[in-house]
């Protein structure tokens, strides 16, 4: 609800003066619109092994914090190597005795049930996701939860059609799959990983991120309600030691990891010489490229969405903006105007555009890299307005006059920070965009179809969006090149990474 601060003052137009620039907060005050649905959180969450919630063998727990308030949400079980072994053994038994013998048609029924049950509890899951991760409720509500359900629906449709995954070849499940997911999209990454593995006939041991385990464990409740046989899906929670134990366990035939490039390299080194199959979805430093014939207003919205969606906690975030010189000043001006109306604050407020940074450690990293950008001579602009006194927040930030050698142009910041560079020709844009260790995604804004086709061919990125950004669909494969990883997730191509061919 909006309230006019003062309707007694005569307007600028009435006084014959130019109308002032409208900035939220100058003329209007917005009442909070908090989400009030009960997330139904438990005080303590146990491990989910062999179809049951069980206490960790060590008896140890760690706290899950709300990044918007820094308050404890719940205690989470800390799994050790013995817990991981129990989970892997349960998954192997389930595969040998039940899941591996089921027809695709029967497996599909379970996946459909999970999708429908998730839809039934969508609002509850959205609130839990926002409280645990810090993202705005409108993103959890409108993207994360619906997309998670969509992945289960989509892969349920594939479960009885697997002969078409690789026509002319015989496909078979791998057995037990170990999966490790990040903290930026906890529920969606669960669905992203679980759905194709289960559709193909594999059993799973999944480790959520340490800071965002709650929605994975709530999903375990749905898995119980859906009646999945015990051991088909197992969740082990903990820190790096838990993940290392899972990666090193001899039972899983495949490792699926989404996270930082640094950790991905450690995992690959540890698995060198083994016969385990791997997919790695790692970091990114995506180029968002705007040509002078682009629809500028539409491009500005795409740029804002590309970098500030989920506080920039997105591996494919458009964190490097390349603008053709002739329109650079115009684009930067419009970006600043748009940033002035971004609302940063309580993630549970439906008006909020940018929520809380996921953890204190991530906030520290963002702050350090922004300071490096200032020190190296880039020109900084940050959105105005007050930040909440409590919680981990960072202002949406853009840097202009950035050089390719600057750290902010080379390193993944994983926060709401945009580096702006310019180019003159298409060839220069391609060369600069490809001058990175990463190759996950890119965006192109132009009116010319021929230019889009050439750019999508020349850019070394797994996904290229044209006149849009951050568009995802379960039917479309997602993955990168170079230090952004290998393998694909989603679509028919994603299923290939969860099977063996004969």
Tell me the role of every PLM-derived stretch:
Residues 262-403, 432, 466:
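ALDH superfamily catalytic-core signature
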Residues 71-162:
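Glycine-rich loop-to-alpha-helix module at the N-terminal edge of alpha/beta enzyme cores
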Residues 72-79, 96-100, 179, 288-291, ...:
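Short, well-ordered beta-strand elements within core beta-sheets of diverse protein domains
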Residues 161-298, 351, 423:
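Rossmann-like NAD(P) dinucleotide-binding subdomain of oxidoreductase/dehydrogenase enzymes
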Residues 70, 107, 129, 201, ...:
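Residue-level signal for inorganic ion chemistry
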Residues 2-11, 69-74, 228, 252, ...:
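Conserved C-terminal structural/oligomerization subdomain of aldehyde/semialdehyde dehydrogenase
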Residues 95, 99, 115-122, 126, ...:
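Structural signal for hydrophobic packing residues in well-ordered secondary-structure cores
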Residues 2-68, 155:
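Hydrophobic face of amphipathic alpha-helices that form TPR/SEL1-like repeat modules
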């Amino acid at each position: 609800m909006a309230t006019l601060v003062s309707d007694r003052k005569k307007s600028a137009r009435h006084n014959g003066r130019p109308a002032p620039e409208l900035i939220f907060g100058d003329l209007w005050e917005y009442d909070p619109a908090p989400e009030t649905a009960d997330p139904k959180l438990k005080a303590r969450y146990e491990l989910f092994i062999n179809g049951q919630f069980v206490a960790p063998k060590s008896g140890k727990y760690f706290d899950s914090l709300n990044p918007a308030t820094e308050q404890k949400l719940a205690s989470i079980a800390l799994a050790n190597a013995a817990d991981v072994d129990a989970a892997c053994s349960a998954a192997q038994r389930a595969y040998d005795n039940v899941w591996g013998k089921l027809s695709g048609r029967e497996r599909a029924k379970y996946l459909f049930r999970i999708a429908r049950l998730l839809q039934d509890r969508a609002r509850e899951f959205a609130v839990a996701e926002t409280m645990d991760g810090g993202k705005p409720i409108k993103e959890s509500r409108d993207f994360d939860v619906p997309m998670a359900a969509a992945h289960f629906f989509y892969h349920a449709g594939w479960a009885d059609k697997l002969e078409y995954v690789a026509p002319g070849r015989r496909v078979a499940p791998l057995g037990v799959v170990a999966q490790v997911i990040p903290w930026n999209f906890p529920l969606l990454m669960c669905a992203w990983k679980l759905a194709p593995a289960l559709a193909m006939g594999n059993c799973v041991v999944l480790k959520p991120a340490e800071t965002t385990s709650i929605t994975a464990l709530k999903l375990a409740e749905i898995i119980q309600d859906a009646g999945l046989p015990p051991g088909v899906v197992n969740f082990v929670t903990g820190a790096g030691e838990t993940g290392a134990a899972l990666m090193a366990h001899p039972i899983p035939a495949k490792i699926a990891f989404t996270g930082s490039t640094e950790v991905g390299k450690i995992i690959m080194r540890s698995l060198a010489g083994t016969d385990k199959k791997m997919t790695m979805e790692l970091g990114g430093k995506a180029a968002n490229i705007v040509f002078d014939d682009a629809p500028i207003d539409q491009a500005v919205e795409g740029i804002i969405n590309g970098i500030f969606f989920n506080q920039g906690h997105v591996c494919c975030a458009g964190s490097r903006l390349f603008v053709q010189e002739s329109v650079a000043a115009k684009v930067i001006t419009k970006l600043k105007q748009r940033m002035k109306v971004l609302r940063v604050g309580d993630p549970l407020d439906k008006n909020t555009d940018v929520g809380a940074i996921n953890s204190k450690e991530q906030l520290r990293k963002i702050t350090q890299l922004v300071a490096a950008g200032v020190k190296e001579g880039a020109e900084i602009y940050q959105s105005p307005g007050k930040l909440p006194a409590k919680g981990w927040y960072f202002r949406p930030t853009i840097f202009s006059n950035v050089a390719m050698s600057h750290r902010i142009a080379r390193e993944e910041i994983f926060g709401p920070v945009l580096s702006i560079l310019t180019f003159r020709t298409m060839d220069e844009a391609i060369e600069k965009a490809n001058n990175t260790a990463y190759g996950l995604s890119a965006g192109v804004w132009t009116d010319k179809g021929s230019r889009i086709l050439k750019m999508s061919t020349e850019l070394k990125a797994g996904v290229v969006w044209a006149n849009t950004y951050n568009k995802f669909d379960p039917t479309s494969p997602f993955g990168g090149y170079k230090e952004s990883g290998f393998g694909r997730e989603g679509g028919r191509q994603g299923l290939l990474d969860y099977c063996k061919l004969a």
